[in-house]
Amino acid sequence: MTRRWELDALRGLMLVLMTVTHLPTRLSSPLGQPFGFVSAAEGFVLLSAYMAGLVYGGMARKRGIEAMRTAFWRRALKVYACHGATLLFLFTVIAAVGVRIDQPAVKDLMSYYLTHPLPALVSGLLLVYKPALLDILPMYILFLLASPWVLVQGLRRGWTALMGMSVGLWMLAQFGLDMWVYDAAVRLTGLRVPFQETGAFSTFSWQFLWMLGLWMGASRTRPDPRPFIFPGWAVALALAVAVVCFVWRHWIGQAPFGANESLNLLFDKWRLAPLRLFNLFALMGLAIRFGPGLVARMPRLRALETLGAASLPVFCMQLVIVLLVLAFFGANPELHPVWLDMLLVIASFSALYAVARLALRLDRPADAKRAKAS
């Protein structure tokens, strides 16, 4: 399949925003959630699912179900290897530095590992223990493992029932489905990893984004795919919601209702709360409606395109960079000078771009082999 540069560039933009948000600099707060009450994580997961549906759905139609299933499992294994490597990096290099210089940011981030090293290592490799910052790849791996079955059902029987089940799981997650499943696992297996150490993301909420993206991507592989068309009133509503949320976020801050935690939960990121999804759908609608025209008029964004085309190694590298910065400089940017912020940002993106170029160069022989096989 021919790569679509605009999708790579958009994924590259998500990686840039995630890096800026995670790096402990003075830019992280003003540039966090820059488009409203939606973060780069939502866009990255949705776009990754869309690409998976587009690529692997097309593979299933052209080369068969087994080829698609094998490719999904190979991708899941690759992501698992990357997650395992970053996890071991955290448990060795970052732990050693953090303990040696008594860095609170590191000791707080991996407190469970520091008190229970062996159970943390085993449960981390089993995708149960998920330290902060390292909790999105385990969710991604689970989605990849489930996707072959989902795609087969969607291609053979349609997506209505699948999306209905997905919405149902999302709704149950708003009322604590993750905790119910955790409690059941504790009773059945004697699991000792505390609930708060199993990752901030609600898997049962975020699966809805993955399912939505997977369906949208797979639908483009039909011989005569119907374009996504929205009526004028829906576009106007999406524009109004997007503008209101954009102004609201930059006027009030990232907590939409200030200190009112009960109302802030309506925009909760970790459970993909209803108002957050409303904001995300508004931005999606605008991107689908105006994106093609914008892409036709704008120049190619080569740097973002390069980052997005090598999204997995770039994502892992930004984790390594952020962990190193936390270990040596801490989590409070006010404790170091502004010039260090600028130096960290420039050095970080230089490293990410270099990793992306290297990864793409190393992948060329494999890409050529796959293209020849197809």
Language-model features: locations:
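Alpha-helical transmembrane segments and their immediate juxtamembrane cytosolic regions
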Residues: 1-374
